[in-house]
């Protein structure tokens, strides 16, 4: 069904459902904006229901829009991943792309479904809006005193930064060998490998860097999801207090 192309884009069944979910979600956001106090793109806010509604359905303008938009977003993301599966199978490729994308979906679900379910109310979900979302992040940080002390957050941020560094190095080495000076020949992979062996003593290779990149990216998404799921459902105190175990550690050098 819908097995055709529009220009270079493959449509497919899940392409159609992706467009339907996306269109409905955008329409609901515009509806919430039209009924709200402002059209300022920075201040548009689609808030989750009040905590008093628990895990039930809320009235449209009291969080119901947020619930419907969330359903549309989940449907759109899942259909997009299934579209990637469909295209990969047609081309005889592996399913590495939808597999990696599924970790991004998991990170989103952690914010708007998994954590609210564990805490017993949809009101614990993240709002939709630029400034409102930043305020929500800030409030979560203050709620746990110093969120940067969250060990899962530390691991996630480490993977994010390492991913940026790895692919910054990868992209720059590709550009450097393919853009030689005037009168010089284009260099090959042997020059790439030699450069990194000279600089850091080891070259992971052209295939290895992409395997590493996938690992770093999905690890960053996974641990970012874990860090927010832990905060509230499994740990309610300030995150600096979690590290008190180190003070009682037999081989601690502190104190």
UniProtKB/Swiss-Prot annotation:
GO CC annotations on file: plasma membrane light-harvesting complex; plasma membrane-derived chromatophore membrane
Binding positions for Fe cation per the UniProt entry: 170, 210
GO biological process: photosynthetic electron transport in photosystem II
Binding site for a ubiquinone: 196
Binding site residues for (7R,8Z)-bacteriochlorophyll b: 133, 153
Annotated TM spans: 12-35, 64-92, 95-120, 150-179, 205-231
Annotated InterPro entries: Photo_II_D1/D2_sf (IPR036854), Photo_RC_L (IPR005871), Photo_RC_L/M (IPR000484), Photo_RC_L/M_CS (IPR055265)
Subcellular location: Cellular chromatophore membrane
A Pfam cross-reference name: Photo_RC
Keyword Transmembrane belongs to the record: yes
Keywords linked to the UniProt accession: Bacteriochlorophyll, Chlorophyll, Chromophore, Electron transport, Iron, Magnesium, Membrane, Metal-binding, Photosynthesis, Reaction center, Transmembrane, Transmembrane helix, Transport
Self-association state and partner proteins as the record states: Reaction center is composed of four bacteriochlorophylls, two bacteriopheophytins, two ubiquinones, one iron, and three highly hydrophobic polypeptide chains (designated L, M, and H).
Family to which this protein belongs: Belongs to the reaction center PufL/M/PsbA/D family.
Protein name as annotated: Reaction center protein L chain
Organism: Pararhodospirillum photometricum (Rhodospirillum photometricum)
């Amino acid at each position: 069904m819908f097995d055709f192309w529009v220009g270079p884009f493959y449509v497919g069944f899940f392409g159609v459902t992706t467009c339907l979910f996306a269109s409905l979600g955008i329409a609901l956001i515009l509806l919430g904006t039209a009924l709200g106090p402002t059209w300022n793109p920075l201040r548009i806010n689609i808030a989750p229901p009040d905590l008093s509604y628990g895990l039930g359905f809320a009235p449209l303008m009291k969080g119901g829009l947020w619930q419907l938009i969330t359903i549309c977003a989940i449907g759109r993301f899942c259909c997009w991943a299934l579209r990637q599966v469909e295209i990969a199978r047609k081309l005889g490729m592996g399913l590495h792309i939808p597999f990696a994308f599924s970790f991004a979906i998991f990170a989103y679900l952690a914010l708007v479904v998994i954590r609210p379910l564990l805490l017993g109310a949809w009101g614990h979900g993240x709002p939709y809006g630029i400034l409102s979302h930043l305020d929500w992040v800030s409030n979560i940080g203050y709620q746990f005193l110093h969120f940067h002390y969250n060990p899962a957050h530390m691991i996630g941020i480490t993977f994010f930064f390492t991913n940026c560094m790895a692919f910054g190095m990868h992209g720059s080495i590709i550009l450097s060998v393919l853009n030689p000076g005037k009168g010089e020949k284009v260099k090959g992979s042997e020059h790439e490998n030699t450069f990194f062996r000279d600089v850091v003593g080891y070259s992971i290779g052209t295939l290895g860097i992409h395997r590493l990149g996938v690992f770093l990216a999905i690890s960053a998404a996974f641990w970012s999801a874990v860090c927010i799921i832990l905060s509230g459902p499994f740990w309610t105190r300030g995150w600096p207090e979690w590290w008190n175990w180190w003070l009682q550690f037999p081989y601690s050098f502190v104190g």
